[in-house]
Swiss-Prot record:
Gene3D superfamilies, sorted: 3.30.160.20, 3.30.230.10
Domain of life of the organism encoding this protein: Eukaryota
Organism, as annotated: Leishmania amazonensis
GO biological process: translation
Chain intervals for the UniProt region annotation (Disordered): 1-44, 245-265
Positions with biased composition (Basic and acidic residues): 246-258
Pfam family, one: Ribosomal_S5_C
Listed name of the protein: Small ribosomal subunit protein uS5
Task of the protein: Component of the ribosome, a large ribonucleoprotein complex responsible for the synthesis of proteins in the cell. The small ribosomal subunit (SSU) binds messenger RNAs (mRNAs) and translates the encoded message by selecting cognate aminoacyl-transfer RNA (tRNA) molecules. The large subunit (LSU) contains the ribosomal catalytic site termed the peptidyl transferase center (PTC), which catalyzes the formation of peptide bonds, thereby polymerizing the amino acids delivered by tRNAs into a polypeptide chain.
Biased segments, Basic residues type: 26-35
Domain S5 DRBM: 88-151
Length: 265
């Protein structure tokens, strides 16, 4: 007796994975990555700190207002918001494996150094360790934005045109490495090794002499020593900064009522 049941159609070879309903991967139904939020999805920033709420409400509109009151930056989105899109540059300076001896043997992780800057007086360095290269790079980039500091620029001689060099000699030290920055005349350029030169370019310094001593082959210490030297440019009060200034209120105090409304909302 012939079989009268209709034959079932086989799924097409080029059918998408979501239609096959295989449910593979951590994303579960619909393909790998959907359950975790794929890389193309960007969540809206919800500030967690008072400073973040003021930045999102456009009550604080520049990094100089934050540095004036020495307010800590706890969210990297603050830097992304205050620096115009396309002006903030980042670059991986160094990444290498590090090991730790445990009871189960050697545990290998990766340490990354990242630099961010707008080439206009702001520079940040971040160093983080991760189990994977991508995790270490992302963590170091976030740390660099949280560690961003202002760089004061000045003149070598007459005050003509825009500031082009550092205003005084400064020295930064990390480990056995010491980096000294010396002001240079306009047109000199950055006289430095490749690693400090990249950091000085990101800081917006056009002309400077440099000298270094110690174990400069340890690039991590060389990077941090250059960063510490640039950070010291705001550690001196030169005569042009001796003028009296009127004190102003802290942004968190000035906009206290707005912050209270945001908290209760």
């Amino acid at each position: 007796m012939a079989d009268t049941q209709p034959a079932q159609e086989a799924p097409a070879a080029d059918a998408p994975r979501a239609e096959r309903n295989f449910g593979r991967g951590r994303g579960g139904r619909g393909g790998r990555g959907r359950g975790r939020g794929g890389p193309g999805e960007e969540k809206e920033w919800v500030p967690c700190t008072k400073l973040g709420r003021l930045v999102k409400a456009q009550k604080v509109t520049s990094l100089e207002e934050i540095f004036l009151f020495s307010m800590p930056i706890k969210e990297h989105q603050i830097v992304d918001t205050l620096i115009a899109e396309g002006k903030l540059h980042d670059e991986m300076m160094k990444i290498y494996p590090v090991q730790k001896a445990t009871s189960a043997g050697q545990r290998t992780r990766f340490k990354a150094f990242n630099v961010v800057g707008d080439c206009d007086g702001h520079i940040g360095i971040g160093a983080r360790v991760g189990k994977e290269v991508s995790l270490a790079i992302r963590a170091s980039m976030i740390a660099a934005k949280l560690n961003i500091v202002p760089v004061r620029r000045g003149y070598w001689g007459n005050k003509i045109g825009e500031p082009h060099t550092i205003p005084m000699k400064v020295t930064g030290k990390c480990g056995s490495v010491a980096v000294r920055l010396v002001p240079a005349p306009r047109g000199t350029g950055i006289v430095a090794a490749p690693v400090p030169k990249k950091i000085l370019e990101f800081a917006g310094v056009e002309d400077v002499y440099t000298s270094s001593r110690g174990k400069t082959r340890t690039h991590g210490n060389l990077i941090m020593a250059t960063f510490y030297a640039l950070r010291k440019t705001y550690g001196f009060l030169t005569p042009d900064l001796w003028a009296d200034t009127e004190p102003s209120r802290d942004p968190t105090d000035e906009h206290g009522e707005l912050l209270a409304e945001m908290t209760t909302a």
